[in-house]
Design a protein with these regions (language model features):
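Basic, alpha-helical nucleic-acid-binding regions used in initiation and control of genome expression
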Residues: 1-59, 70-171
Length: 171
């Protein structure tokens, strides 16, 4: 997962305004993991040159960010916790669905997001996301969790996995 909240000074006010709106939505409907991940996405968008956030309304970008991360993490599946409907997002930010979906698509394209994207997955979804753990070792695709601890250590040192599964507490 991306981990930097660095924001260029010229976009700090824009970031703060949008993040305040997304934080309020997360506090009401989602959780702290979503709040943090959305802030990371907004910061990444601020660092793009030119930043797409320079065009459009703040509430459109806020709704788009919530929706984009929701798409990656299956927010709209009622078997997930938390979950909500896209219409709840549009209503909260007072937007038409077409506007929110357009901004969501712009964010997903700009940050190269897709379903179960390891970079944009919620921490609570890491263990269950096979895309995070499938790596090529000696020409074969393997689940790194099934490999020896030394191989897991190497994968972690290279930044290929978020943590060493064999060293995670509770294993």
């Amino acid at each position: 997962m991306t981990s930097s909240i660095r924001v260029p000074a010229a976009l700090q006010e824009k970031f703060d305004t949008i993040a305040l709106a997304t934080d309020a939505f997360c506090d009401q409907h989602l959780n702290g993991d979503y709040k943090q991940l959305i802030r990371l996405a907004l910061a990444a968008l601020c660092r793009k040159r030119p930043s797409p956030l320079l065009k459009g309304q703040n509430n459109s970008w806020a709704a788009g960010a919530v929706h984009a991360l929701g798409m990656v993490n299956f927010l709209f599946d009622d078997s997930q916790t938390p979950h909500c409907k896209a219409t709840d997002i549009w209503a909260h930010f007072c937007l038409a669905s077409s506007t929110g979906q357009t901004h969501s698509k712009k964010i997903r394209d700009a940050l190269d997001m897709g379903p179960m994207d390891p970079q944009w997955s919620l921490p609570s979804h890491m263990d269950a996301n096979p895309l995070i753990w499938m790596l090529e070792v000696n020409g074969l695709i393997v689940d790194i969790r099934q490999m020896p601890l030394e191989v897991q250590d190497i994968a972690y040192a290279k930044g290929l996995i978020p943590y060493v599964p064999g060293r995670k507490t509770g294993n």
